[in-house]
């Protein structure tokens, strides 16, 4: 969580000035894409578990199906939270199932993401890389030849007082810390509205960027340096995300779990690919591959896949997701809070149907707003 806050806290400081009207126009379709993607994953996979898997294995818990979106979309943290809630309500295996789907989701995000990147590069659907098999040597080896090396920034402070790199690192940490404080403050006064730290850090970064631009402070902030810092934090985030993978085997539920995972991967792929082509006017594949990594594994996996097809993050996919996630966070928190209670009381199907109906309403709004795009 700290590294994610640092990544998104540094983004606004390295972004060029754009009008809020332009941002809102750009983020609207991304909000619809991300919100519908979350709701449909819960609804479709949950209903598949209730009305297909339960027919084959009737002794399974009604909430068995929703343990896949718990692990895929939510990740290990959400799996632990919902699993613990179910354990308190009498279903002891929930945590293990959630952790298993979260781990499998990370693996699927990497393997499936790389296959999609190769397909997109081959069919000229990527904006920043060419054929996957003909990538430049520097992208394959990770080492730049002398004639292709860029400056990582310029000195804006005297090393007698403070080193430039230290100054910029401290600035990013301040942004992330303020984002954390805002998130915790909201949590104290409005416990249900638990805003993620990274979104708060991004908003704080935007506010400070406006303040810096209105004064002379921005003259001493190097965009290249903050961009490199964001990339460095991203590298550490990816490494920590991969290192945190915990492999587990649940023998008791092996067969239904395999069926659930196969069906879940297919459903999530259809949602990600179909909606990604129709709710992104620009850089549709870059936005879609980031969503795939996030919705099956973790945000770190999404960032890793995005950096393969967009090494310099020129598509602004991460910026847009940070803004779009703000109105999504409360709905996600409500799901995490009420899913165990509703399923234990036999009302889970109504929750899943509500997610499905809300998804259709958002898609209708996207069509009315002109966000829906028809691609061949």
Q: Can you say where each PLM-predicted feature lies in the sequence?
A:
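Alpha-helical membrane segments and immediately flanking helix-loop junctions
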Residues: 57-93, 97, 104, 116, ...
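Interfacial loop-to-helix junctions that mark the boundaries of transmembrane helices
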Residues: 1, 92-101, 186-198, 221-227, ...
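C-terminal transmembrane helix pair
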Residues: 240, 247, 257, 261-371
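Intrinsically disordered, low-complexity non-transmembrane regions of multi-pass membrane transporters
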Residues: 121-166, 213-217, 371-376
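Structural signature of multi-pass alpha-helical membrane transport proteins
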Residues: 1, 11-19, 149-157, 166-228
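Hydrophobic transmembrane alpha-helices of secondary-active transporters
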Residues: 1-25, 203-212, 227-252, 271
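Interfacial helix-loop-helix linkers and transmembrane-helix boundary segments
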Residues: 14-33, 213-227, 244-258, 280-284, ...
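Structural signature of hydrophobic alpha-helical transmembrane segments
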Residues: 1-7, 62-69, 192-204, 229, ...
């Amino acid at each position: 969580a700290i590294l994610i806050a640092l990544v998104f806290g540094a983004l606004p400081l390295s972004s060029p000035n754009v009008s809020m009207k332009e941002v809102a126009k750009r983020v609207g379709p991304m909000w619809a894409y991300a919100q519908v993607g979350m709701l449909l994953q819960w609804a479709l996979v949950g209903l598949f578990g209730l009305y297909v898997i339960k027919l084959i294995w009737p002794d399974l818990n009604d909430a068995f199906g929703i343990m896949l979106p718990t692990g895929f979309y939510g990740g290990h943290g959400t799996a632990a939270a919902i699993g613990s809630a179910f354990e308190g309500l009498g279903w002891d295996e929930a945590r293990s199932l959630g952790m298993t789907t979260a781990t499998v989701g990370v693996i699927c995000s990497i393997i499936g993401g790389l296959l999609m990147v190769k397909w997109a590069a081959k069919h000229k659907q990527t904006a920043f890389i060419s054929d996957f098999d003909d990538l430049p040597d520097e992208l394959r080896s990770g080492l730049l030849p002398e004639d292709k090396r860029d400056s990582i920034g310029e000195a804006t402070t005297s090393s007698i007082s403070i080193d430039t790199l230290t100054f910029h690192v401290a600035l990013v940490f301040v942004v992330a810390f303020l984002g954390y404080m805002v998130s915790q403050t909201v949590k104290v006064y409005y416990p249900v509205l638990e805003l993620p730290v990274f979104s708060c850090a991004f908003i704080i970064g935007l506010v400070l960027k406006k303040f810096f631009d209105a004064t002379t402070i921005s003259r001493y902030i190097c965009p290249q340096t903050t961009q490199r810092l964001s990339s460095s934090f991203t590298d550490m985030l990816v490494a920590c995300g991969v290192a945190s993978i915990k492999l587990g085997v649940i023998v008791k539920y092996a067969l239904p779990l395999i069926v659930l995972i196969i069906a879940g991967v297919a459903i999530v792929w259809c949602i990600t690919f179909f909606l990604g082509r129709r709710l992104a006017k620009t850089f549709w594949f870059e936005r879609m591959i980031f969503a795939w990594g996030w919705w099956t594994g973790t945000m770190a996996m999404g960032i890793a896949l995005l950096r393969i097809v967009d090494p310099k993050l020129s598509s602004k996919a991460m910026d847009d997701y940070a803004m779009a996630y703000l109105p999504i966070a409360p709905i996600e928190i409500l799901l995490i809070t009420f899913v165990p209670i509703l399923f234990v009381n036999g009302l889970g199907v109504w929750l899943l149907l509500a997610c499905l109906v809300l998804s259709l309403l958002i898609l209708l709004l996207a069509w009315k707003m002109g966000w829906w795009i028809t691609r061949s």
